[in-house]
UniProtKB/Swiss-Prot annotation:
Note: Present with 4380 molecules/cell in log phase SD medium.
Known role: Glycosyltransferase that transfers an alpha-D-mannosyl residue from GDP-mannose into lipid-linked oligosaccharide, forming an alpha-(1->2)-D-mannosyl-D-mannose linkage. Required for addition of mannosylphosphate in yeast mannan. Recognizes any oligosaccharides with at least one alpha-1,2-linked mannobiose unit.
Gene: KTR6
Protein name as catalogued: Mannosyltransferase KTR6
Pfam family, one: Glyco_transf_15
Subcellular location: Membrane
Main location: membrane
Disulphides: none
Enzyme Commission number: 2.4.1.-
Species this chain originates from: Saccharomyces cerevisiae (strain ATCC 204508 / S288c) (Baker's yeast)
Length: 446
């Protein structure tokens, strides 16, 4: 019995030895190692994977290449910065220095490695504006344009905007950007109280009389409209909340956009060297603009250095004379360079106009002040009419008459309601001065 058991144990040990020996041979076979590295290693955590051995010489080579690449990048960055600074200096010099209007604006037209323009939407909210109108205008701009570009919004309000209204605005913009927080940039600010009152040199009794005498002019009896006109003409661009921006797009409560805008308008303005873009123009009531042209001519005589040689005075004067024609770029849609208003020339012009008191003694609007300033202080080719943007405000419409444009941008407006070439508009006058071809059918509108 014991002998039989010993034989079984010996046989078991022999078989086990042979199995272990075969297993060791298999594990150490080259093909087995290759399969192990191919199928097992990739699934190991990085901390457990074998670290490739690099020779000291190879390590020095890699480090040297990294240092060389970093140095090259640093030198390229410095070269680009130096080239940019030199380009700015040369451009400013070519315009006659940074005291000139164009010279002052040069830095805002320089692209830094393809970075987008420093631009934003500006919406002024007064006590007269409803949240329905405000949210409508936000939705129009976000859906038709900004969902593709994510430019910031700046809301400047008359008094503090309460938390509920701010949240409604945030939610409207957030929803249009699919809730992506990285694409949402909203700023709220207040109009300084001293910029929404009569300035100290205004005779308030005389100003009150104009509210009565101009009651037959749209908003002619409104003091608030005059405060707003003065603020937009001379102060909104000074607000610290806009200091970081070069470009603005004014968005008034209640506006509508009729066409899709698939290209970056800010980038286009910057790349084309434009300063101001508009969609609607019209002739303002003569009674509202009493004496403003006389003051403008006096300014031009006192400060001839600010008047552009190739200016756009022909847009604001009659074809057969130097008389003022009351044409204005309607301010409910503006895309412009903030640095134009910040320039020494426009500051001087606005102060000159403001001290005359015509904003309150008559009804000089921000539209007419902007228009005269732009037309006198800039070359005419810096001002652009956006004929491919369908726009609506109040009872006025800009609807592209060019069928190709109308179809390309999915416009949903009635071309028969376009105001550009109608009586009371200055659109036809603009086309004539700029020698632009008018779209087919422009003369068949009532």
């Amino acid at each position: 019995m014991h002998v039989l058991l010993s034989k079984k144990i010996a046989r078991f040990l022999l078989i086990s030895f042979v199995f272990v020996l075969a297993l060791m041979v298999t594990i150490n076979h080259p093909k087995t190692k290759q399969m192990s590295e191919q199928y097992v290693t990739p699934y190991l955590p990085k901390s457990l994977q074998p670290i490739a051995k690099i020779s000291a010489e190879e390590q020095r080579r890699i480090q040297s290449e990294q240092e060389e690449a970093e140095l090259k990048q640093s030198l390229e960055g410095e070269a680009i910065r130096n080239a940019t600074v030199n380009a700015i200096k040369e451009k400013i010099k070519s315009y006659g220095g940074n005291e000139t209007t164009l010279g002052f604006m040069v830095p805002s037209y320089i692209n830094h490695r393809g970075s987008p323009p420093k631009a934003c939407f500006v919406s002024l909210i007064t006590e007269r504006d409803s949240m329905t109108q405000i949210l409508q205008s936000i939705d129009e701009v976000q859906v038709k344009f900004n969902k593709n570009f994510a430019y910031p919004w700046v809301f400047i309000s008359q008094g503090e905007l309460d938390g509920m209204k701010q949240e409604m605005i945030r939610q409207a913009i957030t929803d249009s950007m699919n809730g992506d927080p990285e694409l949402i940039n909203i700023k709220f600010a207040e109009i300084p109280a001293d910029e929404w009152v009569y300035p100290e040199w205004i005779d308030e009794n005389k100003a009150a009389e104009s509210l009565i005498s101009l009651a037959n002019v749209p908003d002619g009896d409104s003091r608030a409209v005059r405060y707003q006109a003065r603020y937009f003409a001379g102060f909104f661009w000074r607000h610290p909340v806009l200091d970081e921006f070069d470009w603005y797009w004014r968005v008034d409560p209640g506006i509508k956009l009729y066409c899709d805008i698939d290209h970056d308008l800010f980038r286009w303005m910057q790349d084309e060297g434009k300063v101001f873009g508009f969609t609607l123009s019209m002739s303002e009531a003569k009674e509202a603009n009493e004496k403003i042209w006389d003051v403008t001519k006096k300014f031009a005589k006192d400060f001839p250095k600010f008047i552009s040689e190739n200016n756009f005075k022909s847009f604001i004067t009659k074809k057969d004379s130097e008389d003022f024609n009351n044409c204005e770029f309607t301010s409910n849609f503006e895309i412009g360079n903030l640095n134009f208003y910040r320039s020494p020339a426009y500051r001087k012009f606005f102060n000159y106009i403001d001290e005359e008191g015509g904003i309150f003694y008559w009804k000089w609007s921000d539209s007419i002040i902007h228009t005269i300033g732009l037309s006198m202080l800039l070359p005419k080719d810096k001002i652009h009419f956006f004929e491919n943007i369908g726009f609506h405000y109040d009872k006025y419409n800009n609807c592209p008459l060019n069928d190709d444009i109308w179809n390309q941008y999915n416009c949903n407006c009635d071309q028969g309601n376009d105001f550009t070439f109608r009586s009371g508009s200055c659109g036809g006058h603009y086309f004539d001065i700029m020698k632009k071809d008018k779209p087919e059918g422009w003369d068949r509108l009532p």
